[in-house]
Design a protein with these regions (language model features):
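Short beta-strand-centered segments that line the small-molecule binding cleft or hinge
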Residues: 107-111, 228-244, 248-274
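Periplasmic-binding protein-like
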Residues: 100-137, 185, 259-261, 268-278
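Sec-dependent signal peptide cleavage junction
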Residues: 18-32
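Flexible loop/hinge segments at secondary-structure junctions
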Residues: 144, 163-168, 175-180, 184-188, ...
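Bacterial N-terminal signal peptides
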Residues: 9-18
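Positively charged n-region of N-terminal signal peptides that target proteins for export
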Residues: 1-8
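Extended ligand-binding regions for polar small-molecule ligands
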Residues: 37, 43-50, 54, 115-162, ...
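Extracytoplasmic small-molecule ligand-binding "clamshell" domains
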Residues: 28-92, 134, 150, 173-251
């Protein structure tokens, strides 16, 4: 009897996976794509939720999701995923891998359609173009000497594997200029805050090393994701960590810039694919498009 029950469970699991995996093929034959729900993502500074959905309305016809829903914090978006308000949490691959490593019920997977590449850089006010150039020069030097690769291992790969790095201690330069950097804590392991309230993550380590090389002081300022634009414009912070879509200029119908007005960005220091976090018991986990 036990063997029979086990066999039935195995067959049911295989059938579920098969049916889910066949959705894309069936859609190709019928010309329609089955919709499962909405995609969540963190709020953007340069475009509203409605504007993004309008730009992507033609693309979303071929998506397994209905529309995008913005969230101000990663915690809010995770709760929405677990409640079923959204079926996909969309962000950069490193953050999705981190989320999946800390949540047994969540899987990481590529998007249904071809993933965009996300480019990591820093956003500054337009009048701080000289500082932008100095930071870009530091990024180039850190790429050349291998510092960025070492930081990726320590602050991304090791953290995803379960290790916690030492606290990041900025070097003090008495009398030197202080640059204030916004930390949201919403994109671990790139940008997060420890249980003790200390800013951690790859981005924090990177800007700390940049400040050291420029012989500047650095101050981390906790800012919510949605308030980054206001914080930058009003001088609460001087730098915001920023992600751009790598092929944004090819987006058909995009009539807005991929960054807020009156800002400049540094040269990129990393690029990773856009990625999905989905519940393991969701049919979406096994739905892939044959690109």
């Amino acid at each position: 009897m036990k063997k029979t029950v086990s066999l039935i469970l195995v067959l049911m699991t295989a059938l579920f996976a098969c049916l889910s995996a066949c959705v894309a093929e069936e859609a190709a034959n019928t010309g329609k794509v089955q919709k499962y729900g909405n995609i969540g993502r963190l709020s953007k500074l340069n475009i509203t939720e409605d504007e993004l959905n309008d730009v992507l309305k033609d693309i979303m016809v071929d998506s397994i999701c209905d529309k995008y829903v913005f969230y101000d914090t990663m915690n809010d978006m995770l709760m929405a995923l677990n409640r079923g308000d959204i079926v996909v949490l969309e962000t950069d691959q490193n953050t999705v891998r981190y989320i999946a490593s800390r949540n047994d019920n969540i899987a990481d997977r590529p998007p249904y359609m071809n993933p965009n590449m996300l480019v990591f850089c820093m956003l500054l006010r337009e009048e701080d173009a000289e500082l932008r150039d100095q930071i870009s020069a530091c990024i180039a030097g850190m790429n050349e000497d291998g510092t960025i690769e070492l930081m990726k291992q320590t602050y991304i790969e090791d953290v995803i594997a379960g290790e916690e790095p030492d606290a990041i201690e900025p070097v003090a330069f008495p009398g030197a200029e202080t640059i204030k950097v916004a930390v949201t804590g919403d994109r671990p392991p790139m940008d997060y805050v420890s249980a003790g309230g200390n800013p951690l993550g790859f981005n924090t380590a990177l800007i700390t090393e940049v400040a050291k090389r420029l012989e500047m002081n650095v101050e981390m300022v906790n800012v919510s994701c949605a308030a980054r634009g206001i914080a930058l414009a009003t001088g609460v912070c001087d730098i915001v960590f920023w992600m751009e879509v790598g092929d944004f200029e090819n987006w058909e119908g995009a009539d807005f810039e991929d960054q807020p007005e009156n800002t400049v960005v540094t040269d990129p220091y990393m690029s990773v694919p856009l990625w999905w976090a989905v519940l393991k018991d969701s049919p979406v986990v096994n739905v892939y498009r044959d690109n």
